[in-house]
């Protein structure tokens, strides 16, 4: 059993001495603030008087030690039965029971979402960048059901008399298995502090990934997020257990999506995907070999939509949407996005050297996701130049970027219709704009009012 006072700091093997000093000072500040928050809890005195112990756990403690801010406060309270604890919490704020229900409809009665009625306390949270909704839980302890398999074999029991050590030992990786009491004591049974200091991601136990195979993706995510190294035994355990990710009955795709949502934009995506491939997780998850080319493209994935397409780029166009549907999500918005990217990338390939149609397809991709024009290996160096022109507004990426626009353009089109004795059809405005846009893409005219006006006055096919 290992306990540490609040003075333990993050050093990190990848930081310069100046960066380390700054990080250490920030770590001290954040840990001190977290202790102050725990001390300021409205219900603290009554819970302690009832025999309770209060601990901040998980990410917020890990991040404070590392000198990083966090917006979620998770608390474990032991020593007080749930009914009594819930009654106490309800005196001081809005308490909502969020206890889990098992497959037989039985609740475990161990979790509450709490929002304090105390405005001053909520201001303290806000000033520290922490959401006012706090997750409060009783300690849990995992046990195995030998008649079941995978994560279903793990029974998570809730009991107010379990220790904080019991609760920490059920966590996924050591850097998440750390707690902080309101007295400023850090509770660490698994050398979490050493792993944080040395930049290591290590499984809490030999069974961590058997208990829940999604933890392998989570381990990769944290390694990529913090630029930590997976320790040798954890690497070995991931390689051994990677095939467990293929069982979609045990692991619904919604859980994969949740992990990817937490990964995108918050991690070194290029490194994360390379780890997924090198450790055999990619093939186990998706049942195919990767064909997406350069790992560096994933650094540009800013959304789960982009990421979902990039993971399968290079596969047959007809298979990409199916791979996303079968392995990641049925969400209509994501699937429609992936279908659109597939369609426009196919149009880029089909256009070949046809400048007009290629630029139209590139514009369509750009309007969906500017980053795709820097990542897709179907896009050549000239296409990337075009993407830069879109970004700098040197080339219109759509009708709204054509320089001749607004009421002036509308009145010009209506005047042209009148001169040619045609019906004042407002739909002709969009048709004229598209006609001009195509001419700009084809290098027939520049994107300026005079060129566009002269072109439309002398090329009347848009009126037909």
Model-derived features with residue positions:
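Catalytic cores of the polymerase beta-like nucleotidyltransferase superfamily
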Residues: 2-464
